[in-house]
């Protein structure tokens, strides 16, 4: 029984080659593992490696198994023997297509020439292996094959095939695949610098565009909006204050100035900056008659409207604003319409206009934001409050 300690590199090489000739794949694998793959590229007769011996095996099944085993274990593909022949050159000479396919898959060179100047393509053309030659030209149709290369006798692969009457080889070399491979090789050779001439200077690279960045005005605008976001709730309560609204397209609004953005009705109510037309429209909506209301008179008009009709002109022209009038508890957040007057003879309507059913809905989208509480009323001041439900 063969043991690993009985093997040396010379004995291991002989045992491995004998296992290949006998078709013993397991024994060959055992020898490679025992010697740590040190004999995988060892030299035998005529300087040939085990891979060169494997491509010449007559049995196709054993040949494929041993060639794949050696290639997967790291055997060198393009090593040469004493005559400069490679494993691919030997496989093309014998016409072993399966071995040629494996060698090309593991980067076998089809243009490696031997001592006579013959390449694997020339060996396949000279020996009449049309299938092998067609596989080579198809595999290298993009990388290119120098089909016009001559050996030391001055013959090309096409001349070698034609001189020996190998029509299939001639057809493979002159067919579309052969022309494509020759054209690709010609393009590659034209791009190379001729001998003795320096390579052309590389063209200057185009300046790469800088990464896309936002314009400076837009960045400054975002910075201002981010800086004013935390101050938008604290300003705008006083009569002469400023309201800074944060967000995209934020603007600064001065209450005492005429230049203000177009605000919605809800925002106008919230800021207390309604125009005279808006105030009149709101007053008309608040005093609209509701016949079924318990607070309406027999004529269908609001009692508050009757009182206002007899009120002095100072009350009718009093400024209209919004205050968080409570519905039973302070700070309920319900926005109401408050009219202030200094006339002592106008009765208070606070008690009559309380409750959720005290008036029509003035605004459906009123803003539920917090506003400061009303100032304490002075002595002798009466108020008329008409609540506007949201």
UniProtKB/Swiss-Prot annotation:
Keyword presence, Repeat: yes
UniProt-listed InterPro entries: Ank_Repeat/CDKN_Inhibitor (IPR050776), Ankyrin_rpt (IPR002110), Ankyrin_rpt-contain_sf (IPR036770)
Swiss-Prot/TrEMBL ANK repeat ranges: 11-40, 46-79, 83-112, 116-145, 153-182
Xref: PROSITE patterns: ANK_REP_REGION, ANK_REPEAT
Keyword line: ANK repeat, Phosphoprotein, Repeat
Coiled-coil annotated residue ranges, if any: none
Keyword ATP-binding: no
Positions of post-translational Phosphoserine modification: 193, 304
Region named Disordered: 181-213, 226-245, 320-377
Gene3D superfamilies the record matches: Ankyrin repeat-containing domain
Name of the protein described by the UniProt record: Ankyrin repeat domain-containing protein 63
Gene it is expressed from: Ankrd63
